[in-house]
């Protein structure tokens, strides 16, 4: 057989009984927010509790819904993880800009180490109530925010650590929920601190620090609480659906307001167009001779009408082959996934839909297992939702120029005149161009190809095509 199933390509989870058991069956009283907690001050929003229930007090129906949804997600995930993910021995696998061929055991191990070192941010439960309500889990609605967190986390890994960095404890992980460490209350949460040490330990310290920035606590700069708070200015609240374009702008605001990350900015493209002068103005320093800031470039796009237009698939593959690409925040309709690579006609992704208990990251040795996935999964390009956001990272001026050269080549490589580029890269500022010149969504019908290729082969529906909300 010309396929291989790496040992670390197995989903590892708790027992089926654990997956089916709703978390929180142990009796406990209603959670009332501590007025002296570290939650965002002045946060307001519509109460989510039923009439007659005090603010911040979830009624029994709300608690049952949350428990049932958590259990349902984990049962569904548990069924999906029983099968192996097979990879072809013939075709290359592209992961975060790196190319792998499974020709020997060493190749498989290198792929395993690289994959498991990506940060995996999923649904969580039992965290402090979100602003404006009593929700203590994002199960069923927060998957796009989690995908956005994973994309930003990949940018931070590139920003603070070498590209060839891998988590030394990654291979051979146990079940994601094997650790009993859980959140113990908001009142005493503080970012962890570590002493300086050897280069390897310093990299591990930085790794843990990055993970802690995504903690499910109001004071974490890129945590769910902060992202939900920033979404309120766009009319969103906890429990709402967030699209990939909105999440891109939320991430930009989060980085802008983060005091821990000072030499990194986020640029979000306008109308499918990246304006090079606007990016340069954002990253340049007052001193012309000073080094540029690093930049994460987020490009919200729509690659078709109701379904993905197959003409964009070659371009998506080209972008995922670049080491400067952070991946794609997208997924299937109303089912967000974080795409980080591909093999043949299948995307590789990290799935945020597994609900795990919240981890208390205030301790220096908090467990990292639940923030790393041991199980690469694949999805056909044909199932990809056309609405998504592509991310890129440039650490300095030279990398930005390299990125511009790569994008110019990829976006202009199409030989078919009827094809539209995914987005455009132009000189100058946005204000220098009229709205008529911007790359908005084409009004012409979606180009369809004959039903002869593998990409358009009919497939039987599966449970993955439906999302319980």
Swiss-Prot record:
GO terms for biological process: aggrephagy; apoptotic process; autophagosome assembly; autophagy; mitophagy; piecemeal microautophagy of the nucleus; protein delipidation; protein localization to phagophore assembly site. The keyword NADP does not apply. It comes from the Eukaryota. Cleaved by CASP3 during apoptosis which leads to increased activity. The cleavage by CASP3 reveals a cryptic mitochondrial targeting sequence immediately downstream of their canonical caspase cleavage sites which leads to mitochondrial import of the protein. The modification Phosphoserine is found at residue 462. Keywords: Apoptosis, Autophagy, Cytoplasm, Hydrolase, Mitochondrion, Phosphoprotein, Protease, Protein transport, Thiol protease, Transport, Ubl conjugation pathway. Inhibited by N-ethylmaleimide. The record marks 62-63 as: Cleavage. SUPFAM superfamilies: Cysteine proteinases. The cryptic mitochondrial transit peptide is revealed after cleavage by caspase upon oxidative stress and cell death. It acts then as a functional transit peptide, and allows the import of the cleaved protein into the mitochondria. This is Cysteine protease ATG4D. It comes from Sus scrofa. The gene is ATG4D.
């Amino acid at each position: 057989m010309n396929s291989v199933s790496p040992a670390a390509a197995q989903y590892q989870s708790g027992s089926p009984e654990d997956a089916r058991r709703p978390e929180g069956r142990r009796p406990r009283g209603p959670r009332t927010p501590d007025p002296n907690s570290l939650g965002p001050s002045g946060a307001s929003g519509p109460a989510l509790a039923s009439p007659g229930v005090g603010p911040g007090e979830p009624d029994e129906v709300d608690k049952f819904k949350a428990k049932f949804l958590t259990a349902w997600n984990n049962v569904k995930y548990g069924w999906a993880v029983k099968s192996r993910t097979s990879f072809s021995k013939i075709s290359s696998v592209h992961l975060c800009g790196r190319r792998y061929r499974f020709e020997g055991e060493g190749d498989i191990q290198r792929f395993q180490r690289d994959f498991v070192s990506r940060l995996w941010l999923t649904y969580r439960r039992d965290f402090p109530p979100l602003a404006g309500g009593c929700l203590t889990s994002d199960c069923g609605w927060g998957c796009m925010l989690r995908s956005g967190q994973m994309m930003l986390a990949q940018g931070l890994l590139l920003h603070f650590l070498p590209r060839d960095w891998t988590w030394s404890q990654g291979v051979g992980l146990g079940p994601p929920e094997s650790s009993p460490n859980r959140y113990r209350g908001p009142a005493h949460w503080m970012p962890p601190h570590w002493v300086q040490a050897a280069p390897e330990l310093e990299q591990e310290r930085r790794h843990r620090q990055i993970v802690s920035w995504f903690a499910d606590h109001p004071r974490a700069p890129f945590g769910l609480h902060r992202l939900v708070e920033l979404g309120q200015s766009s009319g969103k609240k906890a429990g709402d659906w967030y699209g990939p374009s909105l999440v891109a702008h939320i991430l930009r605001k989060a980085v802008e307001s983060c005091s821990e990350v000072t030499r990194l900015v986020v640029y979000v493209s306008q109308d499918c167009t990246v304006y090079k002068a606007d990016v340069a103005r954002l990253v340049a320093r007052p001193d012309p001779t000073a080094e540029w800031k690093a930049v994460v470039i987020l490009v919200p796009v729509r690659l078709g009408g109701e379904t993905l237009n197959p003409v964009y698939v070659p371009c998506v593959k080209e972008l995922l082959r670049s080491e400067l690409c952070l991946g794609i925040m997208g997924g299937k309709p109303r089912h967000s996934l974080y795409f980080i690579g591909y093999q043949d006609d299948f995307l590789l992704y990290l799935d945020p839909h597994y609900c795990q208990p919240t981890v208390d990251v205030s301790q220096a040795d908090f467990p990292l297992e639940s923030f790393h996935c041991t199980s690469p999964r694949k999805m056909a390009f044909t199932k990809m939702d056309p609405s998504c956001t592509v991310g890129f990272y440039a650490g300095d001026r030279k990398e930005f120029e390299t990125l511009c050269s790569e994008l110019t080549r990829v976006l202009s490589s199409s030989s078919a005149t009827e094809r539209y580029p995914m987005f455009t890269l132009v000189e100058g500022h946005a204000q220098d161009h009229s709205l008529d010149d911007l790359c908005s969504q084409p009004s012409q019908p979606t180009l369809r190809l004959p039903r002869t290729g593998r990409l358009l082969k009919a497939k039987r529906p599966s449970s993955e095509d439906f999302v319980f909300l």
